[in-house]
């Protein structure tokens, strides 16, 4: 009884692998990437440039654009892009249209993102959430909408970089909220654009060593957040809470942050070049073995584990 099932499962796995490895013919198609100053965006831009693609790289800073241009071939072109500025987004969309012409835009990679303040929700303000959402959610939405006609023209692909924290909210702050939002946008966009030949993929990395996970930056922003709190709220938590929270965060980040960014850019490249791109990619051992399995557990179990790991406020009543 079990043998036919095992053989069927094995056959399905082999066919899936063969299908997954089918690639499109070598191409010099246009790919637009946001957030190319550093991290995944910069590495992907150089990776695709070496493969012969015509990369259009959006950078936030002139220094980031200049540095990338010096490392790349003459095929790669940079432009300054602040995805939180709708006017700038429209200007860049016109620049992209001029570059791609009648060919259209084959690939859009929404990579730009920020961490914001990672910490207890009662410490935060609405502006704290707004700043992160404007970059991580509303920014990619604006860029995508501006470039959809060019993507439809080429029957291209949209690849949105979210996070495993878009599947499980492991901490407070706007980051998880923003990534959940981008996941939802990506799912609806995939269904809405399928009739027009535009494919949408989501890449949900685990923890990698990028500017978003820079410990010095995360710790300094949380300390500044603590310093502005009213004395009453500080008293609820106690001075020891902040020190313990930072220590736990440091220990976790040092343990699970992966330095091999190519694990992510390989998924991004597959989403752009595979004949049958996946709906979702989960690069990183922690994504596959920790965060995604945890996202399917009962909320009570996840809450209990996270409560056990993180410090308790001084005036906790439970």
UniProtKB/Swiss-Prot annotation:
Phenotype of gene-disrupted mutants: Mutant mice develop normally and are fertile. No abnormalities can be found in the retinal structure, rhodopsin content and fundus appearance of their eyes. Mice display a mild visual phenotype of impaired dark adaptation and accumulation of 11-cis- and 13-cis-retinols and 11-cis- and 13-cis-retinyl esters in the eyes.
EC numbers, comma separated: 1.1.1.209, 1.1.1.315, 1.1.1.53
Bilayer-spanning residue ranges: 1-23, 289-309
InterPro entries listed in its UniProt record: NAD(P)-bd_dom_sf, SDR_fam
Catalysed reactions, as listed in the record: 11-cis-retinol + NAD(+) = 11-cis-retinal + NADH + H(+); 9-cis-retinol + NAD(+) = 9-cis-retinal + NADH + H(+); 13-cis-retinol + NAD(+) = 13-cis-retinal + NADH + H(+); androsterone + NAD(+) = 5alpha-androstan-3,17-dione + NADH + H(+)
Activity modulation comment: Inhibited by 9-cis-, 13-cis- and all-trans-retinoic acids, with the most potent inhibitor being 13-cis-retinoic acid. Weakly inhibited by oleic acid.
Top-level enzyme category: oxidoreductase
Residues annotated for NADP(+) binding in this entry: 32-56
GO CC terms in record: cell body; endoplasmic reticulum lumen; endoplasmic reticulum membrane
Keyword Metal-binding attached: no
An example Gene Ontology molecular-function term: 11-cis-retinol dehydrogenase
Name of this chain's protein: Retinol dehydrogenase 5
Species per Swiss-Prot/TrEMBL record: Mus musculus (Mouse)
Encoding gene per record: Rdh5
